[in-house]
């Protein structure tokens, strides 16, 4: 079995055109990483949850907290089946040593492989050392 996933919201509204979809407000989600006994916490103002495949889209004021890492952005797509988090739009990554700004961060929750990139190949990811 893989990771465990819990989604909480202050409000939820079922999509009448597709009852598998629930629109969420004031969302908090937890991804419990089985292999490492660690937790990724995701919060956002809004969410769109698929009750069949558990895929969730988070939007507006998205925050990821994982160990000493903090990532903020405006849009996050989480696929439990693919074990993939993709956060985009005004992405800022902070840890104890660096602040990084990019267009997109992709994180595989199983392998921890991370891709950080810009949409425009002529632009560069901005990295600043805190120390």
Where are these regions (language model features)?
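Mature-chain termini and adjacent capping regions
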Residues: 1-131
